[in-house]
Amino acid sequence: MPKELTNTHKPWFVYLIECQDYSIYTGITVNVEKRYAAHLSGKGARYTRIRPPLKLLAVIEFADRATAASTEYTIKQWTAKQKRAFAAQHAVI
């Protein structure tokens, strides 16, 4: 099958984590389960090493890294109240 007809691109995800101090961490990854496990084990971002995760609030899928990164940047500019409202619409079940 020609390469252009096969879908070899993995989706990217933006995820929001509520931390123990009730702040919200936003990140991107291709594997949410693996990345969340890294945050839980203290091997994730410095932010979540200092403020350990309480729960995964939301996960949003994107077709490519550029769109996910752009969305991550936008979300990081929001207030905690805006992030919580967004997370409520994209909650992890």
Predicted regions located by residue number:
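GIY-YIG nuclease catalytic motif and its immediate N-terminal context
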Residues: 1-44, 50-53, 58-59, 66-81, ...
